[in-house]
Amino acid sequence: MSNSLRGPLEGVRVVELATVVMGPLATQILADLGAEVVKVEGSELDRSRVIGGGRHPELSGAAVNLHRNKRSIQLDLKAPEGREVMVRLLESADVFVTNLRPRSLASLGLDHETLKSSMPRLIHCAAQGYRHGSGEEDRPAYDDVIQAETGLADLSLKVGDTARYIPTLVADKVSALMLVQAAVAALWQRDARGHAARVELSMFDAVLAFHLVEHLSGATFRGGDAGYGRILNAKRGPHRTQDGLVSVLPYADRDWYELFAEVGREAELLGFPFRSERERHENADTVYSGLASVLRMRSSAEWMRLCAARGIAAAEVVGIDEIVSDPALHRGMLIDDDHPVAGPYRRIGSPFRFDGAASAIRSQAPVVGEHTIEILYELDYSEAEVEALIRHGTAGREAVAQLAPENR
C-alpha cells in the first residue's frame, strides 16, 4: 500500500514494547505520521489483538487499526539471546515506547538508567498508570480504574443516580495522545539541542489534567466548588423534537432570539434567566428546560434548516450503527480495505492532513512475529544465527496464511 505522502516523521524508527490500547495507539499515530514502528511481542498475546472480535485470532477489529503501518517481531525477552536482539533493535531506534511497569522493565534491563549510557540518542518513553517515583508506579491500572480514581466516574453521579464510566476508553486514548505530543517534542529537542530526554507519562496525571480544564472550576480559587455546573446539569443533553433527538447549542444572544422567535416566544428572552450569557450559565436548569420546550414544537428537519440558515451549531443525534454504515454520516473516515489475512474490513481514516493529503497507509497490521526473520537480518544476524534463534524459541515467526475463500 502506498500514498503520495509518507509523513513528517519519515526516517524516525520507533520500537514499541506495549500492550492493550495506550501504547499501541500512541505508536499507531506515530506510524501514521511516517515513523517506522517495530512492535515487539512475546508469547502472550497482546490484549489489543482480541478486542472487538474478528476472523483471525490475532487480528481483531481493534488490532487491524491499532497496528497498521507497523512490523512485528516476536521475542522471548526472558532469554539472554532475546534481550540481546532487543538491545540491538533499540540501538537502531530513535524512540522506545513502553507501558511495562518499572519493575518489569528493570528486570529485563530495559529501564532508562540501564540503557542511557550505551544509547545516548534514544528517547525513552515510559507510560504507566501512576507517576514514576510516587511509590505507585508498579500498581496495575486500566481505563476503568483511572476513570474511577480521577473523579471521572463520580461526575456521572452528579447528573444521575449511578456512577458510570464514560463509554469509551478515554483514559487510554487521552494518555496516548499526550504521549505522542511528548515524544515528538523530545525528538525536536534531541535534534535541536542534542539531548535525548526520558519521557514519563502517568495515565492518572494525564486524565486529571484533561478533565480539570473545566471541572476544577470554582475550586481553582480556594473555597469554591469543583465541577463545571452547566456541563454537570442533568438536563444537558440531546433534546426531543416532534420526531427525533437533536443537539442545538445557542450561545450568542442572537442565537437564542432566532430559536425562540421561530415559535413565537421571543418575549421570554426579556426576563430572567435569558437576559445575558452569564445569567444563562448560572441558571442552566431553567435555561435547558426552556430550550427543551421550544425544540419540541418543530420537527428535527425544521430545526436543522433554521439552524443552518442562522449559523447556529446543531446536529441530529446519529446512532453508532448508522454512522459506521453510512459514508455520508462518517464523512469518509471509514475506508473499505482488504487485509491479506483478516480479509475485507473497514479501516479508520487518519484525522489529520498535511498539505491537503492524508497520511500514508503503507502496510496492513501484521500477525504476531510476521517480520521476525526480516528484522533479524536487518540487525546483522547471520542465517545460522537466525535459524538458531527460531529453533530455540527465542525468536518466533508466525506463518501467514490466507483465509479460506468462504471467510473473505
Task: Label every PLM stretch briefly.
Residues 50-53, 216-226, 326-339:
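Short, surface-exposed loop/helix-turn segments at secondary-structure junctions
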Residues 132, 160-170, 191-207, 225-231, ...:
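Conserved Rossmann-fold dehydrogenase catalytic segment
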Residues 270-282, 317-325, 385-408:
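Short linear loop/turn motifs
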Residues 234-310, 314:
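Aromatic-enriched alpha-helical interface/lid elements that frame and gate functional surfaces
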Residues 176-196, 209, 213-219, 260-267:
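Oxidoreductase and adenylate-handling cofactor-binding alpha/beta cores
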Residues 1-192, 290, 367, 373-408:
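N-terminal helix-loop segment corresponding to the beta1-alpha1 unit
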Residues 44, 129-131, 203-208, 243-245, ...:
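Glycine-rich beta-alpha junction loops
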Residues 309-362:
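A glycine-rich dinucleotide-binding beta-alpha-beta segment and adjacent secondary-structure elements
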